[in-house]
């Protein structure tokens, strides 16, 4: 419910291309018999999470450990157990170099890497690198159990976070470009070449709720610094003022690899704009990419459906 309220401006807008966004202060919910606007509703439900005992774990990485089912922070997860379920978790498998995966007792596809804007937001290669960067990414020279991981050409494996790969040519450059996912602890006893670990997949956790509460407070004209800096303080990062810009950045730093970025960027009104290497499409200024196109097959089956504005 907290997520629904936080995104109410987007969900209640039936014309996202007219340049007139909805106002969360004028969207109302009834909660426990009380009429609250969207931001107050989000805050109310975030408070309810604290009331039932959810809290930040002292160790950020514990939420992604092999036995993270005992986390007091994780609210909604997809349970994984290699001995009980056939479900697989491909994020780590797809990200690492295949020799890196092999050194960990499994395999990998050498694919997914962080984009450069994410790496720069973490302060990589500066004196102000975020404390979560090394917890979330493999970067630089790779070692496993204190031993270097070697590439097929005899060179030591090293990931280059500021290198960009667009075409998967199979070259050494492509195999080492980009920071790779390291957020989840590696289950060295996993099945299916590392695709069936015991780590539960985290979908929603209390740190997210705190950042949601901070954002809702700011949008409602209140101070959200307490919640923002509770999240930052857990990893030893200094105080930061709770502005919408800072909250959006904090959500990137804290929740990277957790699947919220597109929703966040749409809510903050920046998804369709130019940033870093992302160039705005010529006809995108009206924000039509806020929503996806309706598949043509669905329109063919139901003539009453009309394609979303901006798509042909």
Which residues does each predicted region cover?
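Acidic helix/loop microenvironments that form the catalytic cleft of cell-wall polysaccharide enzymes
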Residues: 1-9, 230-236
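Extracytoplasmic/secreted envelope proteins and their assembly/folding machinery
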Residues: 43-46, 225-228, 244
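Long, intrinsically disordered, low-complexity segments
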Residues: 65-103, 107-112, 193-196, 201-203, ...
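A structural signal for alpha-helical segments
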Residues: 30, 37, 223-226, 242
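An aromatic- and glycine-enriched ligand-binding surface/loop that stacks and positions planar moieties
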Residues: 3-166
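C-terminal substrate/ligand-recognition segments
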Residues: 131-231
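Alpha-helix C-terminal capping/termination sites
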Residues: 7, 11-14, 35, 212, ...
